[in-house]
Amino acid sequence: MKDKIAIKKLGTIDLGIVESNPIVFHNELYRFEYIRNGKHRYRHNSIDESYFRLIRVADEAVLPAFGHGLHLGNAFVWKDRIIVTAVEDWGKSRFYQLESTNLYDWTKPEVILEHPSWQGYNTSLCRAENDFILTFELGAPAELVKVPFTMFFARSNDLKTWHIIENTSFGRDFYTGGPMLRYFSPWFYFFYLHGSYENGFQEYVARSRDLKEWELSSRNPVLSSDDDDRILAYPFDAAEIQQIRDAVNINNSDLDMCEWQGHLHMTYSWGNQRGTEFLAQATANCC
């Protein structure tokens, strides 16, 4: 087995946030966050619905909320646009897209993919040659999804109209979750969650030239839970610190990353994969 990529964990920055990803927009680092409502409501969510927000990492400034009522979002930057893809709700059949050019004014969410039999969840978007490739996560129907969850793919050449790429998928025979898709010619790299409640959940990576035939990395797993997840990287109060110290930790999930100042800036989640979860940061050298 090859040596592991050296990922340095920087510590926990929030409680109750799972789906998040870093982006660079106009030479500034931001963190996109999905703020939950309902059973696992974010402790600072003062409204009766989910939403998205951006954090300017340099000073932790919170930008205005957007995407109200949508779920499980993911942000992608293309030139002077921030594109966010999301699902109608956990396990619902419609995927949406909205965008902004200034971080404050957002377009009306538009349906980009839907099917009445789908149970939709997470998405991830990347640029590949002259197209854009979107991966979307489904939990049903059974004829498509053998072992929940399974990832499927769509293509667009204009970031408006999306077409499903026939006969492409990942993870029909084993558990996958929390996708991150990247492209470095000629390979697609797919980061995903794999594991179980009995043995723990870890981040894995696979690659493919065509989104059909996949090769698992010899370096898997690439990210696993350990005590460094509990490093305090934010001025939490005493009760929050105690919650971090006492939490069951069987999971490193929802890894995402971007290049920033010569390094990879990463976000990921840790916790029990049942609602007691934490947002953390990490870094690695660009290979």
Task: Describe the function of each predicted region.
Residues 1-287:
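Carbohydrate-active catalytic/glycan-binding domains of CAZyme proteins
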